[in-house]
């Protein structure tokens, strides 16, 4: 079978996927960018683009890929990255596509565009928990992306603002460029450019939050999913870019750079070392790698945008796990966000993953949403397989129509002022039910989080 397709950029060749009848197109360059410059979209290539292997990941702290570098990250390293090999570079603006092998232009399949988490400092678009999502077997096109991380993606300096008219938010400009590339090219993979659902977890969910608040992303997507982050989040309310200048000036000084040209030419390892040394200083708490009001991607703070009712009015799914980072806070965020938007649905995941570290901790639901349980070392049972299949059905139904409900699925009700229950996914049969916020608060205060 040929995996060649003709896109507006040129001919591209993919490869078979672990799922029968599914084709994968890996490492597609969607843009190029100089350090702390806006991404330039890729619109053409010569010859046949080889999309049979993943592209490099964004340079990131060793804690994300070296087990010995940071014991505090060992849990997540063992869960999601152990045994994997990644390449790290400053040339990393790649995306990946999975689609039915027989999908043709004009099929107009719904598209799920996934943004990975990692605290805006780590991760990539082909970690093993979403390497080969099952969604195309349900008639959806899957897309994952890389974007700029850490100091690569968030530096704010007056010299950069003078140069380009704005500074900061480079990570989000990458996500915007990837969305624009998908809109322009996804029909060649059988996808519907007018039916794109953006989805993210943790920092990826916070990215979704920023995308639905931005005035320059309208028309690029029609639905949104936020897992363990995002919503009406005071944790990530964008500050003016100027508020971050002292932090990044200190990083620049710590790196021994006196000019922007020197800072741009600094080796990545030295840049990340300087950033790491400064971010732990108490006077810079709450500054660094986060969204800013730059006058371009974001022109208002999140609360200002919501007060003006200028967020995207589209269907939303939003939820969290029972042992998440700050579950009571995420609970309130989910309720507040859904109450502001019609056709919004919230979930609560409490499945205790099997193993010697049982729990429904932050990120534990990813294996289920992507249908990639087989990639994990854990002794999953038939119950886990059935739960994952159910969650995938809800998600792909939502991507298709904006309503997660379907035949043979327990009814998932929208959130309203009168209906505040969550869809409970996990230990009990799936059902609508309340969440004991006091129990979540007790757990957060008394039970150590994984990795601690």
Put a short name on every predicted segment.
Residues 338, 356-360, 382-385, 431-452:
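C-terminal lobe and pocket-closing loops
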Residues 148-151, 202-203, 347-356, 410-416:
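Short, solvent-exposed turn/loop segments enriched in Gly/Ser/Thr/Pro and often Arg
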Residues 194-196, 258-262, 266, 346, ...:
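Surface-exposed patches in mature extracellular/periplasmic domains of secreted proteins
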Residues 135, 213-217, 357-361, 414-415:
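Short glycine-biased active-site loop of nucleotidyltransferases that positions the nucleotide triphosphate
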Residues 1-169, 193, 380-391, 400-411, ...:
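Non-catalytic accessory segments of hydrolases
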Residues 223, 230-238, 254, 258-385, ...:
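Substrate-gating cap/lid region and adjacent catalytic-acid/histidine neighborhood
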Residues 413-440:
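C-terminal domain-tail junction helix/linker
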Residues 77-254, 305-327, 337-342:
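Serine-hydrolase-like catalytic core of hydrolytic proteins
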